[in-house]
Amino acid sequence: MLRDLFVKKKKYAAIPSEQVRKDVPDGVMTKCPKCKKIMYTKELLKNLKVCVNCGYHHPMNAWERLDSILDEGSFREYDKEMVSVNPLQFPNYEEKLENDRKKTELNEAVVTGEGTIDEMLVVVAVMDSRFRMGSMGSVVGEKIARAVEKAYELQVPFIIFTASGGARMQEGILSLMQMAKTSVALKKYSNAGGLFISVMTHPTTGGVSASFASLGDYNLAEPGALIGFAGRRVIEQTVREKLPEDFQTAEFLLEHGQLDAVVHRNEMRESLRKILEVHQGEGMAVWQN
């Protein structure tokens, strides 16, 4: 009928068949969790895993992080063979550790070593949240403490990139002890004139944020990083108040004086280079044996 000509027609979208979907290999495309844009993974990797549309910083693994800041081929790893055991006989802990080792090809949640940034020697530690959510157990604490001691021995700056859910519950009090161990190592290093740069990435929470992550001479963070001790819900229930939407973000902490700078990932290497250049040789005269 004539009136049918003026009826708004329904719009339809073609849904790709399973066969079409299978034609795109896994890993070729990546969807941004913030803006939902789908992009080529190689394009994302080229931009240091920062979304080209909205600037969201996707998580980096330890090796990607090291490659992004150190001179090519300069990294030498420390304590690679150190692995966690199960001192408290926590159920299924060994199995979970083994699964993470296979999945990440790491022995623990932190990689430590030395390398150069524009030919300036540094000791560096990078946490990897893929391994037990970057949680700090006995081995993580020991590796970080040893790295700090190595920086003290070499009289060079120490840089750490944190990404952690906090202390590792499967190791109980032994895990909590690492907060004190790492902090004491850094205090000794600081008293001797050492330069410590802490870079907090998403997420840095719990016992890690409450210990070594916040002790830097320079405390930096990546945009949008979640940084805090207790979870948002726990705090709201405790204080019985609604918290700001941007609470515990890097930008919130910067605004309230708890960070020195929020640094875009594409500018991180250059920012570190400038800090090192400013302090190069300066602290050596005050080192105490």
From Swiss-Prot:
Its EC number is 2.1.3.15. It comes from the Bacteria. A zinc finger (C4-type) spans 32-54. Binds 1 zinc ion per subunit. The keyword Metal-binding applies. GO terms for molecular function: acetyl-CoA carboxylase activity; ATP binding; carboxyl- or carbamoyltransferase activity; zinc ion binding. Zn(2+) binds at residues 32, 35, 51, 54. One of its GO terms (cellular component) is acetyl-CoA carboxylase complex. The keyword Nucleotide-binding applies. It is found in: Cytoplasm. PROSITE patterns: COA_CT_NTER. Its cofactor is Zn(2+). Belongs to the AccD/PCCB family. This is Acetyl-coenzyme A carboxylase carboxyl transferase subunit beta. The gene is accD.
